[in-house]
């Protein structure tokens, strides 16, 4: 008799999945290797050993013995395999580098230099690990207080005499450099006059910070290897950023990317932010930040947290750098908080660096300005707000940098691109708002000026008069001071993005060989003025950044909102002065290069189209009574420009 009772289905068990047994083959290998039954936590001894003697299981175990041995061998010699793979990769790279150098050393020079730099730091790390304690024991007898004091005094005296000798010999050829030196003195005296605690100023931090800034500027601007290296680095960044066009053209179309500012410049920020996030994930950014902060902390005597924040500001923005030291913000002193704010105002973010380079701003000057601003920000911050409290972070052992939350390289790249969307929309919104406000202010000022017969009254005109002494103290020629003062006003009262965009317009007109004056309006400024302005604009020190800074820090440490509000204006003024002092240092060190030096050779060999160099040399040619130019140079100059000598 058949049973018509409905049969109940056996329930589906998810035990194996819950226990992590999705891969049954891997589980079988593990169970056989450990000597237990598959799917069981018991060993053969516990279950009587019956399963191991069974036919199919026993045969399966014997057939898997080679795989088990290979797996066990690999597990026991993991470190050896890593060393072998590393050795093979290094050997392959060395062979590749050798072949590249033999074929064309000039073409492989950049790769060779990078290889030497990496090799130097690896050797330094190895020697520090092996010989560091021994060297410290050898140097310890030299740390006698009296000997240490005389060493510091001798070093300070040598630095002072070297600076005086430098100024005497170098400024004899270019007296305008003395104006820039006077500007540094004026800005430092003004900051010292507004210092919170005059008697507590650490002159060690101030002098070492300015000294490091000057040394970096000397290497980048004056020495040939430094100048070539930073020019090469700037060129490589420009080439790297040009790949943005592939992605933006696909999304927006080639016509929009070429003709519309938002689709041409803003995608660069997305791409650069993605690259920075990847570098942060692999740990390269943290390594560079730690090395820079170690140098500043060892020389200037600052604390670990404030130094890390300022070093991080070279690469990230004013709200991202404090994230490096977020766990320590609640316990930092007011002086350390002031340093954090000043560092944020004195530098620009790495992602925005790409946008400014896309404007045509000199990449080497932007990179140098960002690096030089770090020690200067520490120095001037300690001048304005000296330390009078006991810091908890005098040593760097207790301070650690995080490596982010990304689990893999793709997630790091994706999160970097996603985070940049907020930056891009913020920039676009600010540009729309600020340019609209500027147009309204100019219209209102023009309306008010017409009532008293003052024609052309505008915000830029007011800034050109009010800030003209500041531009002159930077070392800018007096005829270029009105334009530079306008740009400084835009940076301070609007933002640096608008100012750099305006500066790029002046540079493009200069490179196109346009006339210098159209009526009473200057169409471009000299190369020296452009370089100094690039340094002076490199920073977030503007009134619109106050809210950004307060909002970012308050979200991390809400209980210290009162402390942040108390010192934010002082930090803003200090950050603005850091950029100005940076420009003054560049003014002391700047020397003309290229056609600006030898116009005779330039005009006698190269003159095919109008450019700034052609304009400058032709103007010098028209005004000269002693220089010898070829008749062809005269004909070419007269073809581009009108002069009485051409008749």
UniProtKB/Swiss-Prot annotation:
Cytoplasmic-facing ranges: 1-79, 128-146, 195-200, 283-293, 360-365, 446-456, 558-568
Cellular component terms (Gene Ontology): apical plasma membrane; plasma membrane
Keyword Hydrolase (UniProt): no
Extracellular side: 104-108, 167-177, 222-260, 318-336, 386-422, 479-533, 592-647
GO molecular function: pyrimidine- and adenosine-specific:sodium symporter activity
Region annotation Disordered: where it falls in the sequence: 34-58
Catalytic activity: uridine(out) + Na(+)(out) = uridine(in) + Na(+)(in); thymidine(out) + Na(+)(out) = thymidine(in) + Na(+)(in); cytidine(out) + Na(+)(out) = cytidine(in) + Na(+)(in); adenosine(out) + Na(+)(out) = adenosine(in) + Na(+)(in)
Entry annotated with the keyword Transmembrane helix: yes
UniProt modification remark: N-glycosylated. N-glycosylation is required for localization to the plasma membrane and the transporter activity.
Domain of life: Eukaryota
GO biological process entries: cytidine transport; nucleoside import across plasma membrane; pyrimidine nucleobase transport; uridine transmembrane transport
Regions crossing the membrane: 80-103, 109-127, 147-166, 178-194, 201-221, 261-282, 294-317, 337-359, 366-385, 423-445, 457-478, 534-557, 569-591
Chief subcellular location: membrane
Glycosylation sites per record: 604, 642
Keywords: Cell membrane, Glycoprotein, Membrane, Symport, Transmembrane, Transmembrane helix, Transport
Subcellular location: Cell membrane; Apical cell membrane
Activity control note: Due to its high apparent affinity but slow transport, adenosine could act as a negative regulator of pyrimidine transport under some conditions.
Record's bilayer topology term: Multi-pass membrane protein
InterPro entries assigned: C_nuclsd_transpt, C_nuclsd_transpt_met_bac, CNT_C_dom, CNT_N_dom, Gate_dom
Membership in a protein family: Belongs to the concentrative nucleoside transporter (CNT) (TC 2.A.41) family.
PANTHER family assigned to the protein according to its UniProt record, in alphabetical order: SODIUM/NUCLEOSIDE COTRANSPORTER (PTHR10590), SODIUM_NUCLEOSIDE COTRANSPORTER 1 (PTHR10590:SF16)
NCBIfam families the UniProt entry points to: nupC
Purpose of the protein: Sodium and pyrimidine nucleoside symporter of the plasma membrane that imports uridine, thymidine and cytidine into cells by coupling their transport to the transmembrane sodium electrochemical gradient. Also transports adenosine, an atypical substrate transported with high apparent affinity, but low maximum velocity. Therefore, exhibits the transport characteristics of the nucleoside transport system cit or N2 subtype (N2/cit). Involved in renal nucleoside (re)absorption.
Protein name as catalogued: Sodium/nucleoside cotransporter 1
Lineage, opening ranks: Eukaryota, Metazoa, Chordata, Craniata, Vertebrata
Encoding gene per record: SLC28A1
């Amino acid at each position: 008799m058949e049973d018509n009772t409905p049969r109940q289905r056996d329930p589906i068990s998810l035990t194996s999945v819950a226990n992590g047994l999705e891969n049954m083959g891997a589980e079988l290998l593990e169970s056989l290797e450990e000597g237990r039954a598959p799917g069981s936590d018991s060993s053969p001894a516990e279950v009587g050993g019956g399963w191991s003697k069974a036919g199919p299981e026993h045969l399966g175990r014997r057939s898997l013995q080679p795989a088990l041995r290979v797996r066990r061998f690999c597990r026991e010699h993991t470190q050896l395999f890593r060393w072998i793979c590393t050795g093979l990769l290094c050997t392959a790279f060395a062979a590749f580098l050798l072949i590249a150098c033999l074929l064309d050393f000039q073409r492989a020079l950049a790769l060779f230099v990078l290889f030497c730099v990496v090799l130097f730091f690896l050797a330094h790390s190895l020697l520090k690990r092996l010989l560091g304690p021994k060297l410290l024991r050898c140097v310890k007898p030299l740390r006698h207080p009296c000997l240490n004091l005389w060493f510091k005094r001798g070093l300070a005296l040598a630095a002072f005499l070297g600076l005086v000798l430098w100024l005497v010999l170098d400024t004899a050829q270019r007296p305008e450099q003395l104006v820039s030196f006077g500007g540094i003195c004026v800005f430092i005296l003004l900051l010292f006059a507004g210092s919170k605690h005059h008697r507590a100023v650490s002159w060690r931090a101030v002098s070492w910070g300015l000294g490091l800034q000057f040394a970096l500027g000397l290497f980048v601007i004056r020495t040939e290897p430094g100048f070539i290296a930073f020019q090469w680095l700037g060129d490589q960044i420009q080439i790297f950023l040009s790949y943005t066009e592939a992605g933006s053209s696909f999304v927006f179309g080639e016509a929009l990317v070429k003709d519309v500012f938002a689709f041409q410049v803003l995608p660069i920020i997305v791409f650069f932010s993605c690259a920075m996030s990847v570098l942060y994930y692999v740990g390269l950014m943290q390594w560079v930040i730690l090395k820079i902060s170690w140098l500043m902390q060892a020389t200037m005597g600052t604390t670990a947290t404030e130094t890390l924040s300022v070093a991080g500001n070279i690469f990230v923005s004013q709200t991202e750098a404090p994230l490096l030291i977020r766990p320590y913000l609640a316990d930092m002193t007011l002086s350390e908080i002031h340093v954090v704010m000043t560092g944020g105002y004195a530098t620009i973010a790495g992602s925005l660096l790409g946008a400014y380079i896309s404007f045509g701003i000199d990449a080497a000057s932007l990179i140098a300005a960002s690096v030089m601003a770090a020690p200067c920000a520490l120095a001037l911050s300690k001048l304005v707000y000296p330390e009078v409290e006991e810091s908890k972070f005098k040593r760097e052992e207790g301070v650690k940098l995080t490596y982010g939350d990304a689990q893999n390289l793709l997630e790091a790249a994706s999160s970097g691109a996603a985070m940049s969307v907020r930056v891009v929309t913020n920039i676009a919104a600010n540009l729309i708002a600020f340019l609209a406000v500027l147009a309204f202010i100019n219209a209102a000022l023009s309306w008010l000026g017409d009532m008293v017969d003052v024609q052309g009254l505008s915000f830029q005109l007011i800034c050109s008069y009010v800030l003209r002494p500041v531009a002159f103290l930077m070392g800018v020629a007096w005829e270029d001071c009105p334009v530079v003062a306008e740009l400084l006003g835009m940076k301070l009262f609007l933002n640096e993005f608008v100012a750099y965009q305006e500066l790029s317009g002046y540079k493009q007109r200069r490179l196109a060989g346009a006339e210098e004056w159209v009526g009473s309006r200057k169409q471009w400024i000299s190369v020296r003025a452009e370089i100094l302005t690039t340094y002076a604009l490199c920073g977030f020190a503007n009134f619109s950044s106050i809210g950004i800074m307060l909002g970012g820090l308050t979200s991390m440490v809400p209980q210290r909102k009162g402390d942040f509000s108390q010192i934010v204006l002082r930090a803003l003024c200090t950050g603005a002065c850091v950029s100005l002092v940076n420009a003054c240092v560049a003014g002391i060190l700047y020397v003309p290069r290229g056609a600006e030096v030898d116009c005779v050779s330039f005009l006698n060999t190269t003159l095919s189209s109008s450019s700034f160099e052609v304009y400058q040399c032709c103007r010098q040619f028209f005004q000269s009574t002693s220089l010898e130019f070829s008749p062809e140079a005269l004909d070419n100059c007269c073809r581009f420009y009108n002069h009485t000598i051409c008749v």
